[in-house]
Amino acid sequence: MSKILILANNSSGLYIFRNELVLRLLQDGHEVLVSIPDTEHAEELKKEGCKIIHTEMDRRGTNAAHDIKLYKFYRRLLREEQPDIVLTYTIKPNVYGGYACRKEKVPYISTVTGLGSSFEWTGLKKKMIVTMYKFGLKGCKCVFFQNAENKRLFEELHIKGKDSKLVNGSGVNLEKHRFEEYPGHKDDITRFLYIGRIMHEKGIDEYLYAAKKLREKYGDKVSVSVIGYSDEDYEDKLNQAQKEKYLKVIPFQKDVHPYIREADAIVLPSYHEGMSNVLMEAAATGRPVLASNVSGCKETVDDGESGLLFEAKNKEALYDTMSFFVETSIDMRRAMGRNGRAKMEKDFDRKKIVEAYIEKIIE
């Protein structure tokens, strides 16, 4: 059996969205090593049988000295552990881990989980990011993409490995995110819920605008909530929104399923995604999703059938969509939820994603 090294920028993404792959590798008899900078889910991964390697990493920083240090660490780690194959996730492991693998002649498979805001830059910054990705992925055995737009962009920019494969994100665990019958609240209140980082690029400004306008139109017949970590820039805005009673703020939750179950619709006005896990989980649970018509969101929705799409960065479009949903019948909402579950079962089952990775690992 093989020794497999996983390079990731945090334990949460690995444990919450990719643990089924980790468990499959362990069950198949492989030795699995995990390089992560945090300890949040390190103990769980260790108990499953992984060897944890603490790795210093400034996930979002642009300090060149820190990044060079990370690259050197990866090269040293590869020499010491001599893995048979390496799996890398997110930009820094993809770039610096990938380049280290190429220099050490170790086969590696990279996953582009999304492009974030870096590819919206222009000029020298954009050129630098593209060059870094070219260095990181040049020798890659296979590059996995989570949406077609990311794959197309990389092809246009001539960023490529030896092979590539398109998958539907990390997929969704259909057993964990089980189908729940539509709530049909007797109080006739329509409950909207946003789950995710409370930050500008997730469309939180548009969401706050729509929430306030919905309150003005419908009063107590609409409830708008958020769950997630807040960037410091939004603390005052959230406090004011709560004070004016047009938003409910729920602290970060490890298990969001109970909240999805009680929601009438999940809303994600994001500017860009790799493939939204929140939308997949909501659809799997049988809840309509209202999402930006952007890559990483639109793939999870059949517009008008399992949810509604709207123009990103357009606060009026978001408000109009949420307002339209308030006016829909319970039967229409229930049908949307069932259609969403069927879509997840057909195209987004995480078991299928795991098989796609296993196929490339043993190839």
Located regions from the model:
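Donor nucleotide-sugar binding/catalytic pocket of nucleotide-sugar-dependent glycosyltransferases
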Residues: 53, 134, 138-179
